[in-house]
Structures are given as structure tokens and as C-alpha cells.
């Protein structure tokens, strides 16, 4: 079947399915998601959508339907659940990008249009915390790529880890520019920073890898992180500046993890990086495994350090 025939088949299936669910008195709205809402479909594509229903106790939050031989994957939420989901979808997150390209097919409740419209806004606080999260993820991947090259002396597997890391670096670049990273984040970032992504992405994916090439790519990635460190890890620095005291990783994770998912293990590479770069001073902090534990342990803690090496 040619391209036009495939697209017509999917359009017919969508129209038929929407016509049915619109007649269901329990369904308030239908939102088209995924490739059919913004991209091309092919014979192996499915249709993604979200059905918003009246408040009730649902036995399933997801169903796979079929129409004209095409699978329709539908997330099912009550009106209140949908509103909470939108509110919790932090700006620049995957959920945010997924919603951003969605399209309301119909709604029987005009207030849902206003809820959906809020998705277009990218909050500065969300953006900063998303950069922090991505920066932490990037440092974790970078450490693995460095280990495979410098410790295990395997340039090819080091390149494999760098290729996995490229998507995170691309998301960083996209979010830095006030945009929302999509599934095609590498293509978005390549338009914003062509030199870096040409050298690292195309260089690793498009050719053979040797130790010298892997080392050069790692050096470029390290510089990429160094040039952006104050922007990526700004929430950590701002928090410690405000506290003016030593704070443990657990305390920082509790404070900074309210917007995006951040636990102490995720945050540790960022604080370690900032300490190595002279921005933070490390201290051990007393800790216990459980509130009832009697054995005293230690966890990493940090305090802000000024340009002269003085803690403050």
C-alpha cells in the first residue's frame, strides 16, 4: 500500500473510533497522542490516545482497542485524574512533550480545553529542575563511558555508552534554549548546536571507533558539561547559598526532588562534580539506616565554597 493509502486507512480508523466513543455518555473527551497527531504513520504504527471519562472507579487505566485492523492504545483517566496528571507533568519532561504534540479530538467539557492549554507554558522553575535532573543523568553516563575507555580499555563499548548519553545531552541543549525535547531530541539539538552534535553524534554513529576517537569524544562531552555546569546545577548552588550551612545529600534530595524525580544517588554525581570544580566543599554528615537504628553511619554533605576556597 502506498503512503497516501496508509494515511487514509489510519484516518478512517480514527474517525470511526472517535465517532463511537463520542456517543458514549461516560466519555467526556478524547485526545490524540503519538505519531498520528504530528508525524507520519506507516503500516506498523498504532494509534495512541487518551480518553477522559466521568469520575468513577475504573477497573483499568489502559485499554488496547482495534478499529479497521489498527491497534488503538488508549489511556483512560477520570477528569480529576487527568487534571492532576497535567499538573504533575513537569515542564520539559517526557510527559510534557507527549502532551504538547497532542490534539483534542473532541471535548464535552470546555474546562478541559483550558487545562490542555496550560501545557504550552514552560515554567522557569520546572526548567531549572529538569536541567538539574538531566545534568545528573549525564554525569552518570559519562562516568560509565570514561570507565570503559580508561579502566577497561574498550573504546568500542565506551562509544556505546556515549551514544546512549547523546540523547540526554540533546535534551539538555533543547531545554537550555527554552524548548521542550521531543523523541527527536537529537535532531532538535543538532539545529541548536550543530558543531558539537556533528562531531560527537555523527562522529560516533557514522564511523569506526578507536581509542583516540573515543578519547576525543569524551573530551568534547566533558567540555560540554563544564561550560554548562553553573546552569545545569544552579538549583543545588542556590539552595546551599540560601541555607548558608552544611546540608546532606538526603536533605538536598528532599528539597530539590519535589519538582522532578531526584534521589540522593541521582544527585550525588552532581555534587561530586561541583566539589571537584571548587564550587562546593564536602563534609561527612551523620546518618542512620532507619529512624530506629542505633548504629551511626555517614552520608555525603556539602557546603557552598567561594572563589577563594572559603566555605560560606
Please annotate each region the language model reported.
Residues 22, 99-100, 275:
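Alpha-helix boundary recognition
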Residues 31-78:
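Catalytic metal-binding acidic patch
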Residues 126-286, 290-293, 297-298, 302-312:
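Conserved nucleotidyltransferase catalytic core and NTase-mimicking acidic/glycine-rich helix/loop elements
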Residues 20, 45, 172:
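Short alpha-helical functional segments enriched in proximate histidine and acidic residues
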Residues 14-15, 58, 264-267:
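Generic non-transmembrane alpha-helix signal with a bias for helix starts/N-cap capping motifs
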Residues 1-28, 269, 304-312:
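Helical scaffold of the NTase/Pol beta-like nucleotidyltransferase catalytic core
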Amino acid at each position: 500500500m502506498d503512503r497516501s493509502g496508509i494515511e487514509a486507512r489510519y484516518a478512517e480508523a480514527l474517525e470511526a473510533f472517535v465517532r463511537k466513543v463520542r456517543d458514549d455518555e461516560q466519555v467526556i473527551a478524547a485526545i490524540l497522542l503519538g505519531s498520528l497527531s504530528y508525524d507520519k504513520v506507516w503500516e506498523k504504527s498504532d494509534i495512541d490516545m487518551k480518553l477522559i471519562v466521568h469520575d468513577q472507579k475504573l477497573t483499568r487505566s489502559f485499554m488496547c482497542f482495534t478499529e479497521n485492523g489498527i491497534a488503538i492504545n488508549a489511556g483512560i483517566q477520570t477528569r480529576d485524574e487527568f487534571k492532576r496528571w497535567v499538573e504533575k507533568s513537569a515542564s520539559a519532561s517526557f510527559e510534557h512533550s507527549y502532551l504538547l504534540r497532542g490534539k483534542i479530538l473532541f471535548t464535552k467539557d470546555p474546562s478541559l480545553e483550558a487545562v490542555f492549554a496550560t501545557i504550552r507554558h514552560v515554567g522557569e522553575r520546572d526548567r531549572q529542575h529538569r536541567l538539574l535532573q538531566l545534568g545528573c543523568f549525564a554525569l552518570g553516563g559519562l562516568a560509565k563511558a570514561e570507565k570503559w575507555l580508561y579502566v577497561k580499555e574498550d573504546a568500542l563499548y565506551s562509544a556505546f555508552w556515549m551514544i546512549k548519553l547523546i540523547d540526554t545531552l540533546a535534551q539538555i541543549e533543547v531545554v537550555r534554549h527554552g524548548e521542550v525535547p521531543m523523541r527527536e531530541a537529537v535532531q532538535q539539538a543538532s539545529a541548536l548546536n550543530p558543531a558539537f552534535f556533528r562531531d560527537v553524534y555523527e562522529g560516533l554513529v557514522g564511523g569506526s571507533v578507536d581509542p583516540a576517537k573515543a578519547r576525543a569524544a569524551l573530551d568534547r562531552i566533558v567540555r560540554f558539561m563544564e561550560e554548562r555546569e553553573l546552569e545545569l546545577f544552579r538549583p543545588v548552588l542556590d539552595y546551599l547559598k540560601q541555607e548558608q550551612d552544611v546540608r546532606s545529600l538526603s536533605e538536598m534530595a528532599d528539597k530539590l526532588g519535589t519538582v522532578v524525580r531526584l534521589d540522593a544517588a541521582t544527585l550525588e554525581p552532581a555534587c561530586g562534580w561541583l566539589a571537584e570544580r571548587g564550587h562546593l566543599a564536602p563534609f561527612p554528615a551523620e546518618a542512620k539506616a532507619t529512624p530506629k537504628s542505633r548504629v551511626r553511619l555517614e552520608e555525603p554533605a556539602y557546603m557552598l565554597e567561594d572563589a577563594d576556597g572559603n566555605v560560606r
